[in-house]
Every structure is written in C-alpha cells, then in structure tokens.
Amino acid sequence: MFASRIRSRALGLHPRARFENTRLPASTTGRRYKSDETLNRVSSKITQPKSQGASQAMLYATGLTEEDMSKPQVGISSVWFEGNPCNMHLHDLSAIVRDSVHRAGLVPMRFNSVGVSDGISMGTKGMRYSLQSRELIADGIETVMNAQWYDANVSLPGCDKNMPGVLMAMGRTNRPSIMVYGGSIKPGCSAKGQKLDLVSAFQSYGQFITGQIDEKERFDIIRNACPGRGACGGMYTANTLATAIETMGMTVPGSSSCPADDPKKLVECENIGEVVKTMLREDIKPRDVLTRQAFENAMIVVNILGGSTNAVLHLIAIADSVGIKLTIDDFQAVSDKTPFLADLKPSGKYLMNDLYNIGGTPALLKYLLKEGLIDGSGITVTGKTMKENVASWPDFPADQDIIRPLSNPIKPSGHLQILRGSLAPGGSVGKITGKEGLRFEGTAKCYDYEDAFIESLERGEIKKGEKTVVIIRYEGPKGGPGMPEMLKPSAAIMGAGLGQDVALLTDGRFSGGSHGFLIGHIVPEAMEGGPIALARDGDRIVIDAEERVVDLDIPTEELEKRRKEWKAPPLRYQKGTLKKYCTLVSDASHGCVTDGPI
C-alpha cells in the first residue's frame, strides 16, 4: 500500500484516485468455484514435487517463501520500452498490477516483451519489423508462460501490434488471462488552438510540400501533436484492437477507452488482482471467452466505429490461436449488415478521449445491446456476461454527436469491404467510409517500394484533376517483408489535397490513421507473382466498392504474356529475423500467422 501511495504521488494523482469506483462488477455466484488449494495446478508442477528441488531452490532465490510455494503464480507481461509514448508508462502500471496481485494472495512474476513503435518506424525500413513484432510478442509470452509454469497471465500492451500479440499468446496457452490496455494519449493543441494528434503530424508533410503551410506551422504541429503518454488518440489500430478486445470480454469494463494518464487507469491496475483470483477460482480461460459469438461482436463494433483495416488481420490471427477459423468473408458478411455510426478520426473529427468523456466503450456496448446489434450473453474475464458488466453503466448523454443514432448513420453498411477481382483474386481489404465515393476508375502509376512514390509526389508527378491509381507493391508479408503500413503515402496524398483524385492500392497494409480511397492486403502479393506485380503505368484500374471488385482492365492475353515475362526478385533479407518471417508467414487473407493457419 505504501508503494502504491508513492507511485500515485509520482504520477501527480490525488490519493483518493486509488479508491475511485472503476465499475468492476461483483463476481458471479453462478459458476462453481475451485478451492484456493487447487488454484496453483500449473505452477505446482515445479513447486511441489521433491524431484523438482532445483526449481524450488531457484524460486527461493527470487525471494519466494515456503508459504508462496503453494500459491498460484501469475505472469505479468508488459510490452514496456521507453522509446514510445504508447509504451513508456507500462512498467509503472505493471508495478501496480504486481502489488494488486500480491494483495490478492497470489505470487506476481513480472517479465517484459519486445515492441515496435509504428509511429516512429512509419515510412522507414523499420516498419518492416512492425507486424513481425506481433509474432515475437506472442511467441515470447507463450514461451515464458509455459517454460515458467505460470498459472495465469496479466498482459499490459500499448502500441498497435501489442494487443493482438498478447491475445494470441493467451489463446495459445489457454490459462486464465486478462489484458490491461495502456490507454490512449490525450489530444495535442497547436499555437492556433487546433486539436492535434499523430496523424496531424503525418499530414503536415503533404501540406508543407504543396505550400499550404510554412515551416513554422509545420514545426508547431509536430512539436505539439503528442503531449504525453498513451497510444495514438483516434480510432486507429491500437484503439480499434483495444475496443474489439474489450468487446470480446478479455478486459475489465472501460479498459479500452480510459486514457493513459487518467487516474482511473491506475485504479484498474489496483483492482486487477481480485479479478485474476476470480478467473483462477472459476477456471475462466481465454477459450471460454473468445467464442465465435465474441468475434462476431468484435467485427460488428469495428464496423460501427470505423476502425482500422488491421482488425481484419489481427482478429483472424487471434481466432486462429483459439482454434476458430475466421475468414475475410466473415468480415464482409458483418459489414453488409452493420451501420457505420462513429464520427471518430481518421475519417471523422473526434478522438477516443471524446468517446471516454461520454461513457466510453461500456456505454457504447450498452447502447448496441439495447439496439440488438450485439449479443451480450457470453462470459467475460470478470466472471459475468457483457450484459451484466455494463448494466449499471450510464447511458450516452442525449446531446452527444459522436455516435450517431441508427436512424442517421454515416453509412448504412460497414466501411470495411472485401474486394476481389483480376487484380486481387485472393482478396483485398478496402476502407470505404463513403466520403471518398464508392467507385474509382483511373490510370495506374506503379511503384515497387514506398519511397519511390513519395519521391514522385515531391516532383509533382501526381496531378490534381487527373484520376490516378497509385500502386505500391512488393510491400506484402514476404515482399516488404512484414507488410509495412502505408500511412506516410496516404497521409501525404490527403495532406496534398489529392484525396478526390488518387486511389491507393497496395499489397502492404494501412495504418488505422489512414483515410482516403484505400485498398490494401492484396492477395496474392507481388512477391508471389500476383497480378499486382504485372500492372504497368497507364493501365486502367477499376475499383467498385458496391460490387466489391478491383480489376486490372487489360486483355487476358496481355496479362498472361506479362506473367510469363515476370521473374521473382530476391528476398530483401537473406538472414535474421525477417528472413525467418518470410519463410513462415501466411498471406494476408489468412492473418499473416507464422504457425500455420488452421
């Protein structure tokens, strides 16, 4: 308790903040409890047998007592590193979680995972490591949990790939597990009073090179866009995944929408030990929570919120980890019946902090349950159902305009569209909010890597008024490698005022912060000889979101001629972790998993 007071003071929080109501629901009495003596059924494999005396000697050396040897051990995995605002505070949060777990009569064991800052690496070769870091996080947590024989897991992620990484590890190990989201950043503010976020910084480059802002204005934006700790503030990838994971029931209510520097985030951590103990006593495991219905709910909420296309990749991969086969066509079926309601960035004007101020994710789930859009009957990590979790949560204020009523949606169907056609026979993912139109025809300009397009834009080769389909290829899971995100190009297009004139196609991915007429995840990728590798400058490209078609409009004979002439380029990496990734990774339509899709 004394240590908790010190941390609260260090973070500038009033001592009472530690005791605020975080609306953690009381444990249900409907499930059968196990006695405390059986809660260490995993760790007892090394703490009890006389034949494991060396294991016990090592544990005594870490500070465990004789009494501790009969208690459950909880692995607390933090994706902490100092070089990223999304993650820089997670070590402090994990210390609060550690103390909470200890107070609950359990043995906390902290360990760390690797991470990549998508915002820092974006537009550089470093971005090739981003998606691959999801696998490293999953592999690392799985490794420690299994090798150390921990009974339960608490994971604290912050940046984009962290969330699916920790969930995949939970699915693989299938021990009582819970996620504590690090929370999102609060908005920045320019000298002119303009609300800013990280995407403002990305778009400032396009504004600068087209003369819309000068150097002083550009620097003001990048200096003030990110005011402190927390993940990027819009409905970008981190917040999309955190919200989806809360929807599925793998966090306590409110975890996904509570800002990183809000006192209630500390309270969430203070209370997590009792939640873990409930999961252990009731034997609530990830595969009990992560059901097909839970994934259905998550896909609905992603479409309601206008969330990141990365949700397609990551939810497929998480489902794979618990033995559920989720497909890109499942996303299309959900999108067809789900309205797009949220006026959130990148396509709207509000941030996650604004949603938090009107009740956050629990208020959203309560609203969607009331409207019959999601199913609230599934069990969650609290031991209660989603419906029970949010029953006492306040409704949205009557005058809020962040979440539209069903009678007035931004778009009557979802923004995530699965497109196929002669350019993407294995599928692709479009982010079509309706603002950019539903059909685009234009002339192809092809680039074999991201920077080649940026250089072309700087030379003024992309003209306003001309309908251009920019194709950035050899950026897929194997070709990139790592399927880097094209936020730098998409933000430059929007910043340059070319959003109505340019569509962007790629076998890479898009950041959750991207918006415009965007089609990514094209399968087969260029490195595997997909039709995207065969497109040439001047080809006519047709994209029809209503018909869900993306076509390379050239004669079949010409396409076959080009196919025979095409030769696969060498892999960009011949040694190291990315070489291993290229060897193992599945295609985008199967989630880019590296342990073989089910």
Curated annotation (Swiss-Prot):
Keywords, sorted A to Z: 2Fe-2S, Amino-acid biosynthesis, Branched-chain amino acid biosynthesis, Iron, Iron-sulfur, Lyase, Magnesium, Metal-binding, Mitochondrion, Transit peptide
Top EC category: lyase
InterPro entries per UniProt: DHAD_IlvD/Edd, Dihydro-acid_dehy_C, DihydroxyA_deHydtase, DiOHA_6PGluconate_deHydtase_CS, ILV_EDD_C, ILV_EDD_N, IlvD/EDD_N
Subcellular location, record wording: Mitochondrion
Keyword Isomerase: no
UniProt binding sites for Mg(2+): 118, 160, 485
Domain of life assignment: Eukaryota
FT transit peptide: 1-111
Involved pathway(s): Amino-acid biosynthesis; L-isoleucine biosynthesis; L-isoleucine from 2-oxobutanoate: step 3/4; Amino-acid biosynthesis; L-valine biosynthesis; L-valine from pyruvate: step 3/4
Binding-site positions, [2Fe-2S] cluster: 86, 159, 232
Disordered: annotated span: 23-50
Broad class of the protein's primary localization: mitochondrion
One MF annotation (Gene Ontology) recorded for this entry: 2 iron, 2 sulfur cluster binding
Active site: 511
Cofactor(s) needed: [2Fe-2S] cluster; Mg(2+)
Biased composition (Polar residues): 40-50
Mechanisms controlling activity: DHAD activity is not inhibited by the dihydroxyacid dehydratase inhibitor aspterric acid (AA).
Catalytic activity: (2R)-2,3-dihydroxy-3-methylbutanoate = 3-methyl-2-oxobutanoate + H2O; (2R,3R)-2,3-dihydroxy-3-methylpentanoate = (S)-3-methyl-2-oxopentanoate + H2O
Pfam families: ILV_EDD_C (PF24877), ILVD_EDD_N (PF00920)
Single Gene Ontology BP annotation: isoleucine biosynthetic process
Domain text: While most of the residues in the catalytic chamber are conserved when compared to the housekeeping DHAD, the hydrophobic region at the entrance to the reactive chamber in astD is more constricted as a result of two amino acid substitutions (V496L and I177L). Narrowing of the entrance could therefore sterically exclude the bulkier aspterric acid (AA) from binding in the active site, while the smaller, natural substrates are still able to enter the chamber.
Family: Belongs to the IlvD/Edd family.
Stored NCBIfam families: ilvD (TIGR00110), PRK00911.1 (NF002068)
Protein known as: Dihydroxy-acid dehydratase astD, mitochondrial
Source organism per UniProt: Aspergillus terreus (strain NIH 2624 / FGSC A1156)
